[in-house]
Design a protein with these regions (language model features):
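Hydrophobic alpha-helical connector segments
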Residues: 33, 47-79, 131
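Residues in soluble alpha-helical coiled-coils and helical-bundle/repeat scaffolds
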Residues: 25-29, 33, 51, 55, ...
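Helix-turn-helix
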Residues: 1-33
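Short amphipathic alpha-helical interaction/hinge segments
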Residues: 46, 72, 76, 110, ...
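Short, basic, alpha-helical segments at the C-terminal edge of helix-turn-helix-like DNA-binding modules
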Residues: 36-43
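Amphipathic alpha-helical packing segments from all-alpha helical-bundle domains
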Residues: 43, 75-83, 91-118, 122-129
């Protein structure tokens, strides 16, 4: 993200450099706004949509994995955006902080769904960690057909929901 320059960005968008600085104090402020926007879209809106889908916890877990592996995720930045932000966070402490907050929020939500589905707390935490790890890993399978990724995630979810 070091390559972002206000003048170049303004020119690309067809606005003045002054217009950029009217909205953002500096490039760092733009980056923070981008990450905060992504956090809201890719976390809170996804959780809201999952809860709004209704049904029991298993139905909502299925909806969540379907959303993550489908083109519906494009509305939330998509798999490529998520992978780029994770790469960015490896080199930028501010991005890493927001990504850490996103990961914690998402995992807590999924742990809650697994508990609601009847898993014991330790099993729910382990299942959530495994499912979330698979979802994050799916970001790097962009060459795989989304339907195949969706089916694989559903298979994993079925296995994780089995009683101990």
């Amino acid at each position: 993200m070091q390559a972002i320059r206000a003048e170049r960005l303004a020119r690309t968008l067809g606005v003045s450099k002054g217009s950029f600085y009217w909205h953002f104090a500096d490039i760092s402020a733009l980056q923070t706004a981008m990450l905060t926007h992504w956090e809201a879209l890719a976390t809170e809106q996804v959780i809201g949509a999952t809860d709004s889908a209704g049904g029991n916890a298993r139905v909502r877990l299925t909806f969540l994995t379907d959303t993550a592996a489908s083109d519906r995720s494009d509305a939330y930045g998509g798999l490529a955006t998520e992978a780029a932000i994770r790469d960015w966070a490896r080199h930028d402490p501010a991005a890493a902080k927001i990504l850490g907050r996103v990961d914690a929020r998402r995992q807590d939500y999924v742990v809650g769904l697994f508990k609601e589905a009847g898993l014991a707390p330790n099993s729910a935490t382990r299942a959530a960690r495994l499912l979330y790890g698979a979802l994050v890993g799916a970001e790097h399978l962009l060459q795989s057909p989304r339907e195949q990724v969706r089916q694989d995630l559903q298979h994993l979810l079925t296995k994780l929901l089995l009683p101990d």
